[in-house]
Regions:
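Extracytoplasmic gate region of multi-pass secondary transporters
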Residues: 42-43, 217-269
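Helix-breaking motifs and short loop linkers at transmembrane-helix boundaries and internal kinks
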Residues: 54, 85, 106-111, 140, ...
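Conserved MFS/SLC helix-loop-helix module at the cytosolic interface between two early adjacent transmembrane helices
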Residues: 72-111
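Cytoplasmic helix-loop-helix junction between adjacent transmembrane helices
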Residues: 116-153
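C-terminal transmembrane helical hairpin of 12-TM major facilitator-type secondary transporters
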Residues: 276-325
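A late C-terminal transmembrane helix in Major Facilitator Superfamily
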Residues: 334-365
Length: 399
């Protein structure tokens, strides 16, 4: 009887593996949205922290870099997730990030800020290493769509985050924003309850040495793409409120402008991966890599109301490449999804850290607007590297 039923059970497993499991995807992307809402507090609070603690732009940039530092652990976290499943990190991360980011105003000095942001960085790393692999497994044959929804949820969180932080700043003041953390605690509780109904998945692996040549060919161009793209998106994503407030904008206007940019990224994230499922990863990634720096140049050259539509296009194209690259990694490393994503996230966060500090140094020496010009120039170097990405395997294993 076992021999007779075995083929049908295998067929059921294949169908299940190829199916887009919306309920599981929604659970994970909800966690991503809530987590990234709180992790997006730094940029809108940065002008006030600079004023309160008399920070230089270089010190301000280092704060963003501190949150990225724990990303060095991402490959290890990804490796462990492939072995034993670490979804508890996905459950706890919203509560941890909500607590630390709502307490930034309590910091009496630069060192305390560093400690709080390092804890936030640990939460970010622990969340972002396993969660994309969870999305890929739940997305079946439509990994691009799953990654688009995942990234869109994060971008939506980074859209709401500046607005929530600006509201909290005006309502409670910088040193009394702690009540804003409460929804994050309830979110972790709700995610825990929802995850109880989802079975634990541990990846069935081949040896990592077998896929190492593929990983090398893939990550060689990706490292360059991530590095130069990091400067392009960090300028607007981290320093836009500081630039605008330095030029006379109000707290609310600066926060709203950042939210507009991030919301455009939500749309870009949804479209990027989904379109790449149909047209191919490389063509879509190449197109957005060409258009994104052009839009940043446009933002710097326009003034008044014209900056808004240009900023929307900058967010649309600049933030749409992440789900495409995540899908590329998942396509090439189907038997090592978490560790592949861990390496990708580690490289991404390290490059974002370098970019944040680099732009801060340029801002101190040349001014932020001139620093933004250099970020746009760096973005022009991305598109040639896209051409070096190896072709996606014709047959992708569905895990």
């Amino acid at each position: 009887m076992n021999e007779l039923t075995s083929p049908s059970s295998i067929d059921v497993e294949k169908v299940e593996a190829s199916r887009f499991q919306m309920d599981r995807v929604m659970t994970i992307i909800s966690a991503h949205f809530i987590h990234d809402t709180y992790s997006a507090f730094l940029a809108p609070l940065l002008p006030n922290l600079i004023e309160k603690l008399s920070l230089s732009y270089t010190q301000a940039g280092s704060l963003s870099a501190i949150t990225q530092l724990p990303s060095l652990l991402n490959p290890i976290i990804g490796y462990l997730d492939d072995k034993v499943n670490l979804r508890i990190f996905v459950i706890l991360a919203p509560a941890i990030s909500a607590t630390t980011m709502s307490c930034l105003g309590f910091a009496p000095n630069y060192l305390t800020l560093v400690i709080l942001l390092f804890i936030t960085g640990m939460s970010i790393a622990a969340f972002h290493a396993p969660s994309p692999a969870m999305i890929a497994r739940a997305s079946g044959s439509r990994v691009g769509r799953g990654m688009s929804l995942y990234m869109a949820a994060g971008e939506l969180g980074r859209t709401i985050g500046p607005l929530l932080a600006s509201w909290g700043l005006l309502t409670f003041t910088l040193g009394r924003m702690f009540p804003i953390a409460i929804p994050g605690w309830f979110a972790s509780l709700a995610i825990f309850i929802r995850f109880k109904g989802i079975p634990v998945h541990v990846e069935k692996q081949t040896g990592f040495r077998e896929v190492l040549p593929t990983a090398r060919r893939l990550f060689f161009p990706l490292i360059g793409i991530i590095f130069f793209r990091s400067f392009l998106i960090t300028g607007l994503g981290v320093y836009l409120p500081t630039l605008l407030e330095g030029e006379g904008a109000s707290i609310w206007k600066a926060g709203t402008t950042l939210a507009i940019y991030q919301f455009a990224g939500v749309v870009g994230a949804i479209l990027g991966g989904t379109i790449s499922d149909r047209l191919g990863r490389k063509p879509v990634l190449l197109a957005v890599s060409i258009l994104a720096p052009i839009m940043v140049f446009g933002f710097l050259l326009t003034s008044g109301w014209l900056t808004i539509p240009v900023l929307i296009l900058a967010g649309l194209f600049g933030l749409s490449s992440q789900p495409i690259m995540l899908a590329i990694v998942q396509d090439h490393l189907p038997t090592h999804r978490s560790i592949g994503n861990g390496f990708f996230m580690a490289i991404n966060f390290i490059c974002l850290s370098v970019a944040a500090i680099g732009i801060g140094i340029l801002g101190d020496r040349l001014g932020l607007r001139q620093a933004f010009l250099w970020t746009a120039l760096s973005g022009l170097l991305v598109s040639p590297l896209v051409l070096l990405i190896p072709r996606t395997p014709n047959r992708i294993s569905k895990m």
